[in-house]
């Protein structure tokens, strides 16, 4: 019953996002049929077609992945995954997008003990290793960072924090939203709304849902915390047993 409701809401909530790039593609194909176009105009129209077809392709991929993830119909290949390396790789991958969005990314490695200030990075702490599917784990990071780049207030700092809590690795993504966050966290995860009631921003709201389902497929959890315009996503996985990766 839940998976059936998921599919129904999935189709309903993203239908507008499918129509937008599709309509644009149809319109620009018609424009290209004109006989009196200059080479510059043709190049501009082709550029729009390239961008819109890319958006449509990405949306279809997200729809397929969201459906598979919600039903557990995805292959999981567990292996040791170093979160410190992934944290650094994420910073590198998103350098350009963060710069374009006017955001500063802060990476921190923390340990939840009274002996260490959780607000101070400690390079001597051991790396955090979990057992997960590296492809799905990257997709979680990619989706969450994509949301951060789209919806954060320009000129603010965003954070990816690593911490150990009760034999678990905890990854916290934190940012300041440029849109009101009035919806409940359940609504943000279950109904694919984006945090703003309008549809003036890009995206289809599937990223959080996909990330949550992927985390759960790998024995992890994903939780949201909203405090005014402050938005946190906390992803938690059991730490790998040392024998598994040594």
Range-by-range predicted roles:
Residues 97-126:
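Short conserved segments within the C-terminal catalytic ATPase subdomain
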Residues 51-56:
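Short alpha-helical segment of the dimerization/phosphotransfer core of two-component systems
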Residues 148-149:
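Short helix-loop "hinge" at the ATP-lid/N-box region of the Bergerat-fold HATPase_c
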Residues 110, 155-167:
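Short beta-strand/loop element within the Bergerat-fold HATPase_c
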Residues 71-78, 117-118, 125-132:
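Conserved micro-motifs of the catalytic ATP-binding
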């Amino acid at each position: 019953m839940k998976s059936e409701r998921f599919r129904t809401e999935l189709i309903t909530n993203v239908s507008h996002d499918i129509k937008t790039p599709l309509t644009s593609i149809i319109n620009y194909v018609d424009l290209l049929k004109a006989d009196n176009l200059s080479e510059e105009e043709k190049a501009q129209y082709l550029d729009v077609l390239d961008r819109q077809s890319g958006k449509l392709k990405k949306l279809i991929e997200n729809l397929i992945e969201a459906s598979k993830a919600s039903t557990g119909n995805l292959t999981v290949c567990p292996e040791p995954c170093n979160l410190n390396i992934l944290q650094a790789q994420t910073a590198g991958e998103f350098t350009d997008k963060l710069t374009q969005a006017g955001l500063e990314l802060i990476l921190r490695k923390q340990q939840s003990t009274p002996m260490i200030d959780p607000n101070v990075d400690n390079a001597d702490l051991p790396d955090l290793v979990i057992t997960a599917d590296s492809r799905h784990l990257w997709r979680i990071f990619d989706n969450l960072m994509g949301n951060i780049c789209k919806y954060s207030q320009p000129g603010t700092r965003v954070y990816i924090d690593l911490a150990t809590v009760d034999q678990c690795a905890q990854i916290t993504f934190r940012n300041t939203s440029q849109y009101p966050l009035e919806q409940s966290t359940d609504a943000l995860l279950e109904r694919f709304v984006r945090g703003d009631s309008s549809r003036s921003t890009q995206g289809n709201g599937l990223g959080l849902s996909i990330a949550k389902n992927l985390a759960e497929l790998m024995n992890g959890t994903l939780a949201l915390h909203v405090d005014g315009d402050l938005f946190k996503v906390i992803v938690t996985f059991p730490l790998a047993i040392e024998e598994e990766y040594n």
